[in-house]
């Protein structure tokens, strides 16, 4: 016991001695720390705040220089911290083009986001195909609006497996089942467009919103069939722009009441609730032996068949999806299609109306494939015969690609080129527009020339430049749907309506709102037309 006490006394004495030595002969580090504390004590709060701000500003510039490396971009951040935030609130197409022309790789920095833009075809393809290094990136608030459990946020094998379960929904055979109901929607909106023009005394009026509505109606009918009502379609079509506004590249990362993100979240929840109810009706329809007439039906049929299948892959890829899962997936289909298809519709009607020779060729082809029999209903074989109509659609997609850029986030340091490695956490954006306007592949790329897509032509053989729908593991699921739907839509409108576009100084100017639109919002008039004689009725 006494030995333990002696040890304690000795230990305490030793520590006391060390403490005294530290006081008598302080180390350099301790001296420096005390010096800094004394300095801070003598400073006012204002001076401390100003010093911290200066340190932050210097670090912001230093971090930018380190990440920028040798690629094109502003030498310094002209606006500290925020970068070109104010300019991004009103994006201009001309500024995008200037950025793409500045170099194969260029950069900007907005707040905490360092953004690298790739403007060449090969760099764009490399990024789109490098799922090991990158994954699709949406704005921070998208996770809250689309929901964290949504399949679009899956990565790697989980994403691949989920996607395989969806592939069967957008094959030509599946899409053929949706055509009869789509034709009914087209007929209804042709009558509506003619009526709107008549009520306006055939004076030019903006059709931007009507184009968004018809494309939303076509998409929702493809996805949900007759399970969704006309009122529900109209409500979603009217409010969907709130989702687009909420998911703009620059926005609040949190949801605050009565802001864009708040309204966007409300709209998304409303739409997904409708889709949940539709999913249950589709399950009931298939369980009762009904045939698929929409995407939900086809999905439920795959699940139903998988239950009785001996194929392991079928059971894995077509497990029993809940109504909530189906509703979230269908909302992402709408999210992926609505703005892009609305953009294509606006440009397609403007471009064709402004080129009477193109419109005449479309009408001639439409009569030929129907053998002048106007009772012929839309079907897959009919649409596949519309060679020129499809060339017009493809050239519109090249000439005015709805999607200019696709944002990705870097998962780990990514050697994008021999001279530059994109840092982890950076936003990496492959640009699609330059590849589609490459003069080495597309002669006179800024001219609209449908004939460039004749089979065997230089353009049709340049598969690597055709990036309208992306490439790699996240290539667009709905590209076949787009071509089929728009060939049917343009063919019917060309035959049964006489549509005219009023050209303004802003018609060929590009407005960027998620996708691209004519700046004057598309001034059109529609009149009823006899498809055989060409007679126009008022």
UniProtKB/Swiss-Prot annotation:
Cross-link (Glycyl lysine isopeptide (Lys-Gly) (interchain with G-Cter in ubiquitin)): 164, 198
Span of the signal peptide: none
Pathway recorded for this protein: Steroid metabolism; ergosterol biosynthesis; ergosterol from zymosterol: step 4/5
Gene Ontology molecular function: any one: iron ion binding
Record-linked Pfam families: p450
Main location as per UniProt: endoplasmic reticulum
EC class: oxidoreductase
Residue stretches spanning the membrane: 46-66
InterPro entries assigned: Cyt_P450, Cyt_P450_CS, Cyt_P450_E_grp-IV, Cyt_P450_sf
Listed PROSITE patterns: CYTOCHROME_P450
Catalytic activity: 5-dehydroepisterol + NADPH + O2 + H(+) = ergosta-5,7,22,24(28)-tetraen-3beta-ol + NADP(+) + 2 H2O
GO biological process: ergosterol biosynthetic process
Membrane topology: Single-pass membrane protein
Swiss-Prot/TrEMBL cofactor(s): heme
Amino acids binding heme: 476
Record note on disruption phenotype: Abolishes the production of ergosterol.
Family to which this protein belongs: Belongs to the cytochrome P450 family.
Additional note from the record: Present with 24700 molecules/cell in log phase SD medium.
Protein name: C-22 sterol desaturase ERG5
Species per Swiss-Prot/TrEMBL record: Saccharomyces cerevisiae (strain ATCC 204508 / S288c)
